[in-house]
Amino acid sequence: MKNLFILALLAFTATSAVAQLYTTCSQGYGQCQQQPQPQPQPQPQPQMNTCSAFLQQCSQTAYVQSQMWQASGCQLMRQQCCQPLAQISEQARCQAVCSVAQIIMRQQQGQRFGQPQQQQGQSFSQPQQQVPVEIMGMVLQTLPSMCSVNIPQYCTTTPCSTIAPAIYNIPMTATCAGGAC
């Protein structure tokens, strides 16, 4: 009798879930497609946007002047950028650094041409462009020190266009010649 009750309860719960799904999707196929789908693994882009804004808006001068730095929201941006960066593997940080540098590069290109880069027919899903040395150098010099994280040495010598995109919780492996990376 107890097992029958549990079985009936499970059947009712399953039927309710299916009915709710049907009700939600019965208004049209397009609305079903617009419902957010759960992502099995986190995507890096939101944190990297925060990191690019952090690097561009929170200069070393503002960082040294702590009251101005805190009032400008830099402390919150630093936390939103640095916490996820500290939680990923060093290998994945190399891709994160490339993502930040590319976001900054696209923003600067958009400013140069008077409009955001994405409005010019390019999207973030296209193949990576070569990041200028000045931008990559600024990111590599500033981000690790402001976030107190280590960036692998090969990030300083490997072009971003050759680094495979990483999902942060899957470690990337580097090929090292002679045991040195």
Swiss-Prot record:
InterPro entries: Bifun_inhib/LTP/seed_sf, Bifunc_inhib/LTP/seed_store, Glia_glutenin
UniProt keyword terms in alphabetical order: Disulfide bond, Seed storage protein, Signal, Storage protein
Signal peptide residue numbers: 1-19
PTMs per UniProt: Contains 7 disulfide bonds.
Disulphide connectivity of cysteines: none
GO MF annotation terms: nutrient reservoir activity
PANTHER family, alphabetized: PROLAMIN PPROL 14P
Role of this protein: Seed storage protein. Not integrated in the gluten polymer through disulfide bonds, unless incorporated by reduction and reoxidation during dough making. Increases dough strength and bread volume, but decreases dough stability when added into a base wheat flour.
Homology family: Belongs to the prolamin family.
Protein name per the record: Avenin-like a6
Organism in which the protein naturally occurs: Triticum aestivum
